[in-house]
Amino acid sequence: MSHVMNTYARLPVTFVKGEGVWLWDDQGNRYLDALSGIAVCGVGHCHPVLVKALCEQVSTLIHTSNVYHIQHQERLADRLTSLSGLEKAFFCNSGAEANEAAIKLARLYGHNQGINLPTIIVMERSFHGRTMATLTATGNRKTQAGFEPLLTGFVRVPYDDLEAVNKVAANNREIVAILLETYQGEGGVNFPQANYLQGLRRICDQNGWLLMLDEVQCGLGRTGKWFAFQHSEVMPDAMTLAKGLGSGVPIGACLAGGKAAEVFKPGNHASTFGGNPLACRAALTTLDIIEQEGLMDNAVTIGNFMWEEFGRRLQAWQDVLKIRGQGMMIGIELPVPCSELVPEALKRRVLVNVTSEKVVRLLPALNMQKAEAEQVVTEVSALITWFLESRVK
């Protein structure tokens, strides 16, 4: 009997080794990983440059308290602010913690303006984490069920709907911020219209609100740029990161700029482990690998190849399928729930995920090569075809 709490419906496999885009189970079977730990291992499993850096750091210094200056933390803050155009960084251990920091920042920003009940606009079908604040911000009733009462201070609107935001702006004087995923992951791999972020930026500027972008899943090169918001040339007031930042070593970050950068003062927020030397060394090395190996360009090249190949191989089903993607973030929406494809893919030694009940989600490592990508497309296309032939008439 396992003594691990029953919080996951785990698949019947135990992985013991990883290299690049491959994993091996405890029986010696090899699997092609098209999920990369849900967008965590962006440079692949156990990249040799990362392994060397971590071994060196473990033998030098693992942790000190944030009551002291931490050299690698300062370096990482410099790097992330330089890449993003934001000004300050707070480090924590996960995406949920990063979003919790953003929510606290927005509330404090509101109180500093004399707003007694600061309220944040959030989106339907969003996912921001499982702490109480981020769970409340998340737009998924199944995830929230059983954890009521949820927190106050949030107003929900449809994603990619500027008119809905304008209606809220006209009727609620306690709004202080908008929090959304630049591209939605858990909600079904959804991408907004080209002018959406510009419209949100304009509304925020008109009302003195903060625009806060959750790039926990879509950031750090996955879409072909360092951050997904850079496709829209819109500057947020705050942005959250995690997942791919540490290549598996837990680290999250909340970045802020402009009027949001100086909101937090000593004592307002903290994290015991956040930004420790080991985690920051992992993040710095990850950024080096992405940059030096041209992985953002590779994400675009291989991502486009996969998107086009899926379209070609699944052409017979084009009337019932929706294929969405940017870089190494790809979703294939089926007309019916398809969660059974995940264990079927596992039998074929390919790791994929189904989100929002009907969307096959692929989040490969940014350094996946064409031959490996072609294998993923071949296996997944065959699975989808098999599934649809038995479900769709």
From Swiss-Prot:
Signal peptide feature range: none
Pathway: Amino-acid biosynthesis; L-arginine biosynthesis; N(2)-acetyl-L-ornithine from L-glutamate: step 4/4
Record-listed E.C. numbers: 2.6.1.11
Keyword field: Amino-acid biosynthesis, Aminotransferase, Arginine biosynthesis, Cytoplasm, Pyridoxal phosphate, Transferase
Cofactor(s) listed: pyridoxal 5'-phosphate
Residues that hold N(2)-acetyl-L-ornithine according to the record: R130, S271
GO MF, one annotated term: identical protein binding
GO biological process: L-arginine biosynthetic process
Subcellular location: Cytoplasm
Taxonomy, superkingdom: Bacteria
GO cellular component: cytoplasm
InterPro entries: AcOrn/SuccOrn_fam, Aminotrans_3, Aminotrans_3_PPA_site, Class-III_PLP-dep_AT, PyrdxlP-dep_Trfase, PyrdxlP-dep_Trfase_major, PyrdxlP-dep_Trfase_small
Cofactor note: Binds 1 pyridoxal phosphate per subunit.
Major place of residence: cytoplasm
Catalytic reaction equation(s): N(2)-acetyl-L-ornithine + 2-oxoglutarate = N-acetyl-L-glutamate 5-semialdehyde + L-glutamate
Similarity comment: family membership: Belongs to the class-III pyridoxal-phosphate-dependent aminotransferase family. ArgD subfamily.
Subunit-level organization: Homodimer.
Protein name: Acetylornithine aminotransferase
Organism (species): Nitrosomonas europaea (strain ATCC 19718 / CIP 103999 / KCTC 2705 / NBRC 14298)
